[in-house]
Swiss-Prot record:
Coiled-coil intervals: none
Molecular function, one GO term: protein serine kinase activity
Protein name: Serine/threonine-protein kinase CBK1
CC per GO annotation: cell cortex; cellular bud neck; cellular bud tip; incipient cellular bud site; mating projection tip; nucleus; serine/threonine protein kinase complex
Positions annotated to bind ATP: I316, G317, K318, G319, A320, F321, G322, E323, V324, K339
Keyword field: ATP-binding, Kinase, Nucleotide-binding, Phosphoprotein, Serine/threonine-protein kinase, Transferase
């Protein structure tokens, strides 16, 4: 017997003192792990059991049973969740005992497995077969010590109809030598089989749901069917659930993307090291340097930036949806340009796609022709873009200062604009709003593009319905004032010098007119700060809503080139609606003044750029424009290393003399910006609870807007 007396009689005969419970448990544990004589008996029993199972399978294959189920009647009531009734797996074969009738023993399901599945003293798996409920294995806990009350001996067995205390392991020697009677064992088997049969009936009586699921109506652990009906929930709950889903998806997606990028950087560096004949020490230094950069980048990504981390030096730009500030990071003292965008206005004005487009362009570009993005983040009210500060201002500032460029200066800037636009097109984007305001000058005098899809009044300036409505208002005013309508066809006639009509054959500028143009250009700058905007550089196909491609950016380039050589845009007018009218009739309104001389190549290039989309130069790629005679002699590969015509001279890193900061002081904030500033002050006074309440539904589209970049943030001049 394996009971308490058996252990004491064989193990503690020479010991004068009674062992404590812990020592008895340790001895029982060693028995379970194979250091006891009973292990050989268990192995012999299992081998005999396996042979009997093989014989039963052969008999079953030769002569099926009469009941038609292909197996013994003891398994007819097994629930379907425990396996197939008609073809049980070999793991469910009932063990047979020597000297007994060939009657199968109902065993518990395979979930009642042992805790230890391997013998520590050998590589033999001693639990490959399922034992009877009353039988032990080397992997089962033993009840041979006082510690047995704390052991989870038969919870799974009890779940399927077993008693509180199954047969003790001491019954095994009796089974081997035949001392245990058939009636005792069969009696235990019949009671266990009856219990399993009752639970099987309960399992089979579980009602089915209309969709095939089951509802849990008994103690058997079946699945419970739930019908999804989100419409019963409140709208706020549905929005919160959608927000959680988006945030979780964005979290894991960004984590996977960062892991992929990290692996790509490692693979690229290793391939570069293989192509160089460097020593192992130098290669290890390069790999170690990459590891340090990865650690630094990981720390920076975990750092949550906020507006409080930056000190505003000066406002250098304003718009309808936000502003641009010159800021200094408090902990490092580095200078950046911070672009802020109002979330509520982005949501109301349907600018969500444009917001994402700008961030994607800046994040996906490594080109020297695009403004560098270091970081992007957001709070309850604003989106923030931390970009490099270009102290040279923009091309509009240069045009206001010098009015007209020479052809050599124009050739340099137009060549760089071609390369910049080509870089954007290679990324798969269309700028659609190229104008002098969005062409920035860096500290070396070379240009970079900015404002990708987020220029002031972007949506409105591209909407033809907006201008048509303004034109109808003008006609109504003219009819009310007894003024004649504009003639339908061109030619001479009245209003030859009136810039508000389509009948202008040529604009002959006097000094007074040039002063008016300078005044117009300054008002044009103020117009850029408002919600009205200007369509001076927009291609006509954008207004038509008939589909357009990358060729629309080359129209804008032609309009800018015209302004650089002539002194004003080709379709400028005092009102945006009149500019729209001229653009839609560009074949009649595009004229070159007689008092300003330009070369034939320059005029030809402008005319071929300001043409119909299907005839426009550049529709098949930027090389068409590069090969034009106007750019003869331009070295396209090294132009960025060539000295620029104008290099800004700065007195300090925060010098903003090339930005219209004086004009911005007189430009009031837009109503939306003013309202947002008041709300921010109230939130700061009320504390964090009000800030949490401010998270409205417009936050949902901006999930994933936060961005950080490896190659920028690991450089010395980054954050």
């Amino acid at each position: 017997m394996f009971g308490q007396g058996y252990y004491q009689g064989n193990r503690d005969q020479d010991s004068p003192l009674q062992r404590p419970p812990a020592a008895q448990f340790s001895s029982a544990y060693m028995e379970q792990q194979g250091s006891h004589q009973s292990l050989q008996e268990h192995l012999a029993y299992e081998q005999l059991q396996l042979q009997q199972q093989q014989q039963q399978q052969q008999q079953h294959a030769a002569a099926p049973h009469a009941n038609g189920d292909g197996y013994g009647a003891g398994f007819t009531d097994i629930p379907t969740m425990l396996g197939s009734v008609g073809a049980p797996s070999p793991a469910f074969q009932p063990p047979m005992v020597v000297g007994m009738q060939q009657q199968p023993i109902n065993t518990p399901p395979p979930t009642a497995t042992s805790i230890y599945s391997q013998n520590n003293n050998s590589f033999t798996n001693v639990n490959d077969t399922t034992l009877a409920p009353g039988h032990s294995s080397p992997g089962h806990y033993s009840n041979s010590s006082d510690y047995s009350g704390q052991q989870p001996a038969s919870s799974a067995y009890k779940q399927f109809g077993g008693s509180e205390s199954p047969l003790q392991p001491a019954a095994l020697p009796g089974l081997l030598d035949g001392s245990l009677g058939d009636q005792t064992l069969v009696g235990n088997q019949s009671s266990q089989g009856a219990m399993l049969s009752r639970q099987s009936l309960q399992c089979s009586s579980v009602p089915q749901s209309p969709n095939g699921g089951q509802r849990q109506t008994s103690g058997v652990g079946n699945y419970m069917y739930f019908e999804r009906r989100p419409e019963l929930l409140s709208k706020s709950t549905q929005e919160k659930a959608a927000a959680v889903k988006l945030k979780v998806e964005n979290f894991y997606q960004s984590s996977v993307n960062h892991a992929i990028e990290r692996n790509q950087r490692r693979v690229e560096l290793e391939s570069q090291l293989l192509s160089h004949g460097w020593s192992e020490e130098r290669k290890n230094r390069q790999l170690s340097s990459l590891g340090k950069k990865e650690s630094q980048f990981l720390r920076l990504r975990r750092t949550r930036l906020s507006l409080e981390d930056f000190h505003t030096v000066k406002v250098i730009g304003k718009g309808a949806f936000g502003e641009v500030r010159l800021v200094q990071k408090k902990d490092t003292g580095k200078i950046y340009a911070m672009k802020t965008l109002l979330k509520s206005e982005m949501y109301k004005k349907d600018q969500l796609a444009h917001v994402k487009a700008e961030r994607d362009v800046l994040a996906g570009s490594d080109s020297p022709w695009v403004v560098s993005l270091y970081y992007s983040f957001q709070d309850a009210q604003y989106l923030y873009l931390i970009m490099e500060f270009l102290p040279g201002g923009d091309l509009m500032t240069m045009l206001i200062r010098w009015q007209i460029f020479t052809e050599d200066v124009t050739r340099f800037y137009m060549a760089e604009c071609i390369l910049a636009i080509e870089a954007i097109h290679k990324l798969g984007f269309i700028h659609r709003d190229i104008k002098p305001d969005n062409i920035l000058i860096d500290i070396r005098g070379h240009i970079k593009l900015s404002d990708f899809g987020l220029s002031t009044g972007f949506h409105k300036t591209h909407d033809s319905n907006y201008y048509k409505k303004l034109l109808q208002e003008d006609e109504q005013q003219q009819n009310g004032g007894n003024m004649g309508k504009y003639p339908a066809s061109g030619g001479g006639g009245n209003g030859g010098g009136n810039r508000n009509t389509m009948l202008v054959d040529a604009i002959h500028l006097t000094m007074t007119n040039r002063q008016q143009m300078q005044t117009w250009r300054k008002s044009r700058r103020l117009m850029a700060y408002s919600t009205v905007g200007t369509p001076d550089y927009i291609a006509p196909e954008i207004f038509l809503y008939q589909g357009y491609g990358q060729e629309c950016d080359w129209w804008s380039l032609g309009a800018i080139m015209y302004e650089c050589l002539i002194g004003w845009p080709p379709f400028c007018s005092e009102t945006p609606q009149e500019t729209y009218r001229k653009i839609m009739n560009f074949e009649q309104t595009l004229v070159f003044p007689d008092d300003i001389h330009i070369s034939y190549e320059a005029e030809d290039l402008i005319r071929r750029l300001l043409s119909h989309a299907d005839e426009r130069l550049g529709r098949h790629g930027a090389n068409e424009i590069k090969n034009h005679p106007f750019f003869r002699g331009v070295d396209w590969e090294t132009i960025r290393q060539v000295g620029a015509p104008y290099i800004p001279k700065l007195s300090s890193v925060t010098d903003t003399r090339f930005f219209p900061t004086d004009e911005l002081e007189n430009v009031p904030d837009s109503p939306a910006m003013a309202q947002a500033a008041k709300q921010r002050e109230q939130m700061l006074k009320q504390g964090g609870s009000a800030a949490n309440t401010a998270q409205a539904k417009e936050d949902l589209p901006f999930i994933g807007y936060t961005y950080s970049r490896f190659d920028y943030l690991t450089r010395k001049n980054a954050l």
